[in-house]
Amino acid sequence: MQKLLSLIIVALVLYNIAKLKISSDDNNATIIEQASVNNSANNENQVSINNDPPVSLNGNLFERTISKIVINALKTEEGKAFFENILQPLNKPIDTKDYTIPVHKDLITSLFKINTIGTGNVGPASCGHVVTVFYQISDMSNNLISEDTKTFTIGSGAVMLGLDNVIVGMNVGQAREAIIPAKYAASVGANNDNADSAYRVNVMLKSILPQNFINSNEVKIYDNEIAYRIPLLCGEKIAFNAKITRLANGEVLYDSKAKGQKVDMKIGDITYPLIFSYALQGKVPVGTRTVIAKGQTFKALGSNINKIISQESLPLNEYLMLEINDFK
């Protein structure tokens, strides 16, 4: 444990040093570039020095190697999300009254740089809902690529996987703006010259079906382990063990481990309990996630088929406990 903590602290220090160095070098590059432009009026062929300058690193070979890894990681969206989310828990005060970890709050918001506008009046949308949205997709220079009003199932990737995950958690009437990394915009990138570019997205939610919602204040979620990796997203496939227990008397209603067969599902599959997709989207696949919610959230979305538990036998108004782990 001590070695792990030391490694995390070293990573944090390197992260902050790298940010300071990159910021300093960018500022220096700007000053040098301006001076160069002023002194080269008679030389149109002078090479611009606005390229990324090499970062001067100090320390021994190991320290320089780690620093280079950190700096290269910071150039990617996934790397930025990784390091930013290491810092978040350390910068927050400990609240002994509430140890729950919001499912869709930190990692997803950071990954897609989501900004929500308005409050809306119906929702929130979960992975698996059928939604109608108006969206605009632009490149990073704000050149419009496409816009449309479309109806689709969240998790289907009908437009692009990143858009589906931005919509999760929205209410009807709300708008969001986000930046989608190229990895989660493959269908859009395939039609553009620069397939590795990120995209700006603006989306407004117009309707949700069916109107069967999970409100975060009615669900308690606990993780026994935290790891800073890219989280699971709506529309991805994952295998895991799941156990459902009736809190009133401890009766086990479902246990995949006892059955000897893991649950293998696409997040957003409406033939599985809605609470499964809700708990999985935004979860880093390590440890055990424990969810406490009413039985009605264990119903499958808009379907009489429930691959986990018979909907007729569900105690809708009782609290159940879901445990998911052994991710693969």
From Swiss-Prot:
Q: Which InterPro entries match?
A: PPIase_dom_sf (IPR046357), PPIase_FKBP_dom (IPR001179)
Q: Recall the GO molecular function terms of this protein's record.
A: peptidyl-prolyl cis-trans isomerase activity
- Quickly give the catalysed reaction: [protein]-peptidylproline (omega=180) = [protein]-peptidylproline (omega=0)
Class of this enzyme: isomerase
**What is the name attached to this protein's record?**
Putative peptidyl-prolyl cis-trans isomerase RBE_0327
Q: Which UniProt keywords apply?
A: Isomerase, Rotamase
Q: What is its EC number?
A: 5.2.1.8
One record GO biological process: protein folding
Question: Which residue intervals define the domain PPIase FKBP-type in the entry?
Answer: 128-225
